[in-house]
């Protein structure tokens, strides 16, 4: 409690005063025997024929780029609009591209926990806003820290929003960089904080000049592809796809430059969104296409390009790293 009070005392006080909802009874749909049978069936077999090793090193440096709302609606290889994300489309042929990945939620606070802790998003509550729960979750950064990784997180916005700072610190991120670490002009370059071209440039310089001993893990959350979708880029007439095209442009330039640095050789770059985006606004937002998202593994640590069509969920990423990262078993079950 004292740790969370120091991180965000106002939020911790209001959160404690508002504890009145019994989530256990609200979401207990199955008896224990049926739940166990269903849960066991989710685990893949582990025979040799079903496993593909995808990396050429056991302890890569790991960069996770969580792209704001970057859903399949804008990614042509997933059936999305053409010419919105040409850089991502190109990069999808250079790494391990998962074509049947689905988001688990619709908000950044939920999607962040889904991604980094492998914890399902709840429809009526944000686990990130419940410190008593979020601090007990397993997490990618926590597991990697135990394995000797240095960990840090970059976000160009207000890192206290939705209690994000508390969640990130309690789940293993040792250093946080946010909007207040940039100049005032940079902080106000977007309605939500620092525009993506600025944070991508900052990240590039950090990685290019990094001289830490031992492996490291960095996570980066973008923000420009969020309403009101006002960005310093004007390639498409519709401002919504244009905002995603802007983030795609920033991503493409960043990856192309990073390839030319020594950091690329032992690097695993994982690109996925925090959640999808309802566009075009036709039909129900409960349709599967609304949750369809891209997931791409890039970097010098990747053995060879391949496409994985197996259905998976956003939470699978966190579960994979929490269970396997520090023993060097980076594999895909097919």
Model-derived features: where do they sit?
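Membrane-interface segments at or immediately adjacent to transmembrane helices
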Residues: 1-50
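Solvent-exposed soluble domains appended to multi-pass membrane proteins
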Residues: 36-334
């Amino acid at each position: 409690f004292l740790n969370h009070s120091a991180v965000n005392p106002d939020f911790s006080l209001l959160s404690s005063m508002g504890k009145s909802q019994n989530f256990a009874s609200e979401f207990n749909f199955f008896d224990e025997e049926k739940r166990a049978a269903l849960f066991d069936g989710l685990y893949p077999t582990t025979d040799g024929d079903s496993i593909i090793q995808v990396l050429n090193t056991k302890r890569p440096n790991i960069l996770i780029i969580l792209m704001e709302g970057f859903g399949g609606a804008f990614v042509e290889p997933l059936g999305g609009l053409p010419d919105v994300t040409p850089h991502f489309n190109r990069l999808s042929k250079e790494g391990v591209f998962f074509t049947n990945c689905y988001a688990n939620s619709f908000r950044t606070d939920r999607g962040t926990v889904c991604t980094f802790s492998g914890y399902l998003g709840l429809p009526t509550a944000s686990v990130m806003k419940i410190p008593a729960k979020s601090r007990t979750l397993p997490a990618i950064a926590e597991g990697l820290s135990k394995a000797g990784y240095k960990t840090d997180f970059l976000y160009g916005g207000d890192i206290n929003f939705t209690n994000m700072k508390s969640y990130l610190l309690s789940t293993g991120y040792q250093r946080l960089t946010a909007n207040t670490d940039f100049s005032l002009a940079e902080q106000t370059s977007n309605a939500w904080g620092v525009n993506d071209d600025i944070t991508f440039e900052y990240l590039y310089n950090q990685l290019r000049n990094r001289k830490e001993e031992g492996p490291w893990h960095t996570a980066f959350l973008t923000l420009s592809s969020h309403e009101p979708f006002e960005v310093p880029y004007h390639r498409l007439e519709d401002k919504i796809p244009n905002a995603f095209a802007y983030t795609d442009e920033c991503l493409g330039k960043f990856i192309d430059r990073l390839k030319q640095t020594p950091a690329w050789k032992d690097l695993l770059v994982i690109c996925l969104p925090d959640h999808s985006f309802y566009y075009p606004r036709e039909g129900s937002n409960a349709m599967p296409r609304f949750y369809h998202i891209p997931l791409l593994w890039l970097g010098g640590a990747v053995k060879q390009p391949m496409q994985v069509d197996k259905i998976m969920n956003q939470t699978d990423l966190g579960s994979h790293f929490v269970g396997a990262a520090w023993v060097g078993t980076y594999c895909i079950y097919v």
